[in-house]
Regions:
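Hydrophobic targeting/anchoring helices
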Residues: 1-90
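Acidic, S/T/G-rich, low-cysteine, solvent-exposed domains in lumenal/extracellular/periplasmic regions
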Residues: 59, 76-336
Length: 336
């Protein structure tokens, strides 16, 4: 059941060993839709839930989100020691509650024609065709959301390190006035990091988990969290893990709206060793820098953008799926 539908067994209570499955689905032979079980099990609530599920079978009633995320590493490569890719199945599940979600690597250089929004998470080494797909979607007036950073995190027996990465989007973002700086933001306003610590007592040693101050887990909240945007509605705070600061200098006709910022006491660090640090008393040993300031972590850009590929031959000219339209300016919204 878990492999085919992704459903987990349930229990009546934490202390009940009996397990059961209680899910409701709709299936037309091609598409399986999970219908949320309403909290109040009334006929009216069930009817409403089923009607919402049926909307997914009618074209035009739900907006379509194209999600570009790293392809999962094959089991064979994992056995050969290849590092696992980031998994965004939970994000896909949340989006699927309200949108029609399509997973697309954009390798053919085009965004699906029915897309209303493109979300790019954790991009790594995007090629020219993939960037072209995003660029042309933006030129058509589409909305592009990019979640990226200057570093990838590698965990090994020797520690936790931030490794520089190339998303493939750096020149395209810079063309639109957004640069992801090669640094990490550290903030005294942060979420804790659980670290096992060995203590000695009465001739015995025992290990316990200690929640350490960890400035790389930035706790973003007002006034650093914009309260009046649809994307932040209902959010009181958000934790950003090992984020890089943004420098934003778009064209004059572009409207800039800061979405996420660190606190006034945050600072930048070029250190790539991001292991938690503990002093002799078992406390966090991070020392704030002298130069502290609020750092921009997320922005929204809106206006008329110029194509990154303007006055260039289409990268799809040698492709059987050639897009014969020339890159043009367009009106669009974009977030990075």
């Amino acid at each position: 059941i878990n492999a085919q539908y992704g459903f987990q067994p349930m229990a009546a209570s934490l202390f009940d060993d009996s397990r059961f499955y209680f899910y409701l689905t709709l299936n037309d032979g091609q598409t399986l839709v999970q219908v949320p079980i309403p909290e109040a099990l009334s006929a009216e609530n069930f009817q409403r839930a089923i009607e919402e599920g049926l909307k997914r079978y009618a074209s035009g009633l739900l907006k379509t989100v194209v999600l570009h995320a790293p392809a999962p590493v094959s089991p064979y490569l994992s056995q050969q020691g290849a590092p696992p890719s980031q998994q965004f199945t939970q994000l896909q599940g949340f989006l699927s509650d309200d949108f029609e979600v399509t997973i697309d690597q954009l390798e053919n250089g085009q965004v699906p024609a029915n897309a209303d929004l493109v979300i790019v998470v954790d991009p790594d080494g995007l090629d020219e065709r993939q960037v072209f797909a995003l660029d042309q979607f933006l030129m058509r007036g589409g909305t592009v959301v990019v979640s990226s950073g200057a570093f990838a995190v590698q965990t090994s027996q020797s520690g936790i390190n931030a490794v520089p990465r190339n998303s493939g989007l750096e020149p395209w973002l810079a063309h639109h006035g957004v640069s992801i700086e090669s640094a990490l933001v550290m903030d005294p306003q942060n979420a804790a990091f659980p670290v096992p610590v060995t203590r000695q007592a009465g001739g015995f040693s025992f290990q316990e988990l200690v929640m350490l101050d960890y400035p790389y887990f930035i706790d973003v909240r007002a006034p650093g969290l914009h309260p009046e945007l649809p994307i932040t509605t209902g959010l009181s705070q958000i934790t950003m893990s090992r984020a890089s600061p943004l420098t934003v200098q778009p064209a004059e006709n572009i409207l800039i709206t800061p979405i996420l910022s660190s606190s006034l006491n945050s600072w930048r660090s070029s250190q790539t060793n991001v292991m938690p640090r503990i002093d002799e008393q078992g406390l966090s040993a991070f020392v704030p820098a002298d130069d502290t300031a609020r750092q921009t972590l997320g922005v929204a850009l809106q206006g008329r953008f110029e194509s990154y590929f303007a006055n260039q031959a289409s990268v799809l000219l040698n492709s059987p799926t050639t897009n014969k339209s020339d890159p043009q300016d367009g009106n669009a919204n974009s977030s990075a």
